[in-house]
Amino acid sequence: MRRFLLSLFALATVAVPVARAQAPEALWYATNDERSVQSFLAHADRVSVIAPQSFSMDSIGIIWGQVDSRMVAAARAKHVKLIPLIVNPGFDQSIFHRVLVTPDSRARAVHNITALCRDNHFDGIQFDFENVRVTDRDAFTSFSREVADSLHRVGCSLSAAVVPRASDYPGPTAYHKWIYDNWRGAYDYKALADAMDFISLMTYSQHTRRTPPGPVAGYPWMEEVVKYVLALGVPPAKLSLGIPSYSEWWYPTYDAAEGPRMTGGGLNFDAAQGILARNGAKATWDDKQKEGMAFWQDDGINEFLFLVDARSFAARVALAKQYGLRGYSVWVIGQEDPAVWR
């Protein structure tokens, strides 16, 4: 009860919209996909940080991968910070768990992460460790402190992309508990923000195959998550709001194990426009969710498309500004509505 009362007090005193004088930091994630590379080359002067998802780490702390050389050159020429991501390959839970609990692997990982940043003259590293057990929460936090201390000694920053949640209550169903125990619950937002330079909330892909179709990142849900994280004591200057650049198309599928169900798939803006045109559909603006939405029937079965365009992007940038956040982190460059750059 005391914890609950303290949380209410924090909500009342911390999660208040404020103005941030400087322009928000524009972090864009990237892949080595040609579309992603070309969009960065064309718009590097509008990007504060480029964060390519380029490196993987195995269970003994060995790191491999590389950033596209064209991205490196453009980042240097345009004075864009280069902060690549390190992932657990395939978001394999056991890989990162073994790093955390095996002393030799853990020490090797700290050393290799530091060497990667220092030797390549990166500005920092961002963790993208997902599908992490809630029981590894404290180990993840302490590992992050070790890496942050080591990186800071060589002039590099550390941040983390974190799976969002709006409470520490797992939810009413077995699925809610599973997703909390394996995806959402492992991130101690306040402790990670204290140890690191900032955290990027992955406030997108709000709906999953276990939920009804819905927005890619509904505005009320995003704001709820932001308020919750700020109420925990995370400084706004250490919080970057995740923004999707992609749209989602929901269509019926069937598999033997689960039977018929709806599946959501991510689309770049051009592909989303193509699907709308092919089905004679037009997205209608939802002012509550601040996304476009269209639906149509194929053989009598509803299909849905949730459209992220320049208007929805601008609304989410405004949300980051409203709460005085550090900035925003966009997944992913190359999938966006071209109008976001105008």
PLM region spans:
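Conserved, mostly hydrophobic/aromatic
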Residues: 50, 127, 199, 241, ...
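Acidic/aromatic/glycine-rich contiguous surface patches that form carbohydrate-binding/processing clefts
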Residues: 312-342
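Short, acidic/polar
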Residues: 31-44, 103-118, 181-190, 309-319
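Glycan-recognition patch characteristic of GH18 chitinases/ENGases
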Residues: 22-112
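Active-site-adjacent "subsite" loops/lids of carbohydrate-active enzymes
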Residues: 90-120, 168-187, 204
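Sec-dependent N-terminal signal peptides
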Residues: 4-15
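Glycan-binding loop/region signatures in secreted carbohydrate-active enzymes
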Residues: 91, 245-318, 340
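Substrate-binding surface in catalytic domains of secreted glycosidases
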Residues: 60-62, 66, 133-276
